[in-house]
């Protein structure tokens, strides 16, 4: 007797697209796009991943590296992270641009670059401002990968960002109100209001971060990007 064929859930036999089941949810596509560790997926991971993917796409769109997405506008949390990232880049545009242009990344060195910068950025502790800097740096690394025709690195870099958030920063984020805590400080147009009042946004929102801290953390690892 021929063995009974298994239901393929609509995926053709010749299709290389794989299905990956986690709980009651089936994800279709490359496992790298959804999971960083087998069997590891929680609601908080999905929130962090969505936030990472939105900020990266937003920054790539700003650089005209990808087309503007169609559909609904981003949620309040995504809008707040976008505004915070823009404010960070605006305040430290020249120095940050110099750092970004020095990034020399290859598929073989990308993770080492990412890990060393992230480790240095949070060496002095964690706060929301440094988390914003982390997002901006990750997006810059993605942009550099696209510029160097290494677009396949994009899902990998985003995976690294999510993994770092959900392992190294998870406890701090949860103890500070989760992403709702971030939204309380940065949401509802808080950054735009601070800019209109000509206040230092990072100080007015009482993040621990200052320009010197954020920029200094990135500048201290500038040599990592300058290596040929």
Swiss-Prot record:
PROSITE patterns: BCL2_FAMILY (PS50062), BH1 (PS01080), BH2 (PS01258). This is Apoptosis regulator R1. Belongs to the Bcl-2 family. GO terms for molecular function: BH domain binding; channel activity. Residues 1-21 have a biased composition (Basic and acidic residues). InterPro entries: Apop_reg_BclW, Bcl-2-like_sf, Bcl-2_BH1-3, Bcl-2_fam, Bcl2-like, Bcl2_BH1_motif_CS, Bcl2_BH2_motif_CS, Bcl2_BH4. It is found in: Membrane. A motif (BH2) lies at residues 171-186. It comes from Xenopus laevis.
């Amino acid at each position: 007797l021929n063995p009974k064929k298994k239901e393929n859930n609509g995926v053709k036999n010749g299709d290389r697209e794989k299905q990956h089941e986690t709980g009651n949810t089936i994800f279709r596509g490359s496992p790298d796009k959804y999971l960083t560790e087998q069997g590891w997926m929680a609601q908080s991971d999905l929130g962090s991943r969505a936030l990472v993917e939105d900020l990266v796409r937003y920054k790539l769109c700003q650089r005209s590296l990808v087309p503007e997405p169609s559909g609904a506008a981003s949620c309040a949390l995504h809008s707040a992270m976008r505004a915070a990232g823009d404010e960070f880049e605006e305040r430290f545009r020249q120095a940050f641009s110099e750092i970004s242009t020095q990034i020399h990344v290859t598929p073989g060195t990308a993770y080492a670059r990412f890990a060393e910068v992230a480790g240095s950025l949070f060496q002095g502790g964690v706060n929301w401002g440094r988390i914003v800097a982390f997002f901006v740096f990750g997006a810059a690394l993605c942009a550099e990968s696209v510029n160097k025709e290494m677009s396949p690195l994009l899902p990998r870099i985003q995976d690294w960002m999510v993994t770092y958030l959900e392992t190294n920063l998870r406890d701090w984020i949860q103890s500070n109100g989760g992403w709702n805590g971030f939204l309380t400080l940065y949401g509802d147009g808080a950054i735009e209001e601070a800019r209109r009042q000509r206040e230092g946004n990072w100080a007015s929102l009482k993040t621990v971060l200052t320009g010197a801290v954020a920029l200094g953390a990135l500048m201290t690892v500038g040599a990592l990007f300058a290596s040929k």
